[in-house]
Amino acid sequence: MAKAEMKMPEDFLLKISKLGSYFDSVADTVLQAGGEVVLKKVKSNLSSVIGRGTKFKSRATGELEGALGLSPSKMNRDGNHDIKVGFAEPRSDGGSNAKLANIIEYGKHGQPAKPFLKPAKTASRQECIDAMTKALDEEVGKL
């Protein structure tokens, strides 16, 4: 699975430090807002690359696209909150969605790479930051 790490600007950190005991619930809401933006871009990129440029008729079932989703916000072992865009496992045929996504992203012998995760990460970066900033401002305004 692809890993993306985004650093928060100083004004974010100042707002977050003012939240006090409400930090966890606000962090979940803010991460969810940013994750939805990235998820939407990854889904559109995945839809555009599946079945494109193949020698034979595509056998796509839509199961990979349907398995794409957002994890709940959790605290990792370093004490940072994170949220992940990824694939639900396993497939109905017993295979791995992550394996298929990896093959599509990086290719294999005889099958060229059709990246969809990395372009989504770079394309949605600013939109994600904007959505998270807006969500943070709304949550701080509620308190």
Q: Where are the regions that the model predicts?
A:
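Short, Lys/Arg-rich flexible segments
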Residues: 1-84, 92-93, 98-143
